[in-house]
Amino acid sequence: MDKKKLIKYGLVGGILGAAGSIVILLLCFMYSKVIVADTDYTLTMGMKLLGNISESEMQEQLGFVVAKILAACKKKEITKLALISSDMRNISENMQEDLVKKLKKQDIQLDVLAEIVTDSEAMSKLFAEGAAVMIEKKGVSLYQRVYDMVDLCVENEVSILGVIDTRK
């Protein structure tokens, strides 16, 4: 074989290999069972993203998120709402407590409700309050569980003000 054919086949093989790798990565991303990007909330589920909170910079980011929650509550005249998650064990207790305290200072009562899909008492509290903020952890929260919560809220006319995305 001459040198030109080796270069030609090498380039074509390299390009096809790279394209195949990209396709495989895209398919893995598209068919992932966990939430991996902010657009999963906004585009796929049609929910407003209230903000991203990382545990390392929690205080600065929490102020921004609380301001957005307050604006939504004021707009809809809400004084009591629930904090819901597909798995509240993934959300740090410090973050939950700080959200409750900051909103309480602004005369908004935030009740942390765990497992609303399976716990009937938490479910009835959610229905009584009529409004909720969802908090999920990117890379951990499962699509199906989040969809189940959203469906439950929509069916029972519970307004979801938005979602808070958390990460390490």
Model-assigned labels for residue ranges:
Residues 1-14, 18, 44, 58-168:
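P-loop NTP-binding module
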Residues 22-54:
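Flexible, low-complexity linker/tail segments at the boundary of structured domains
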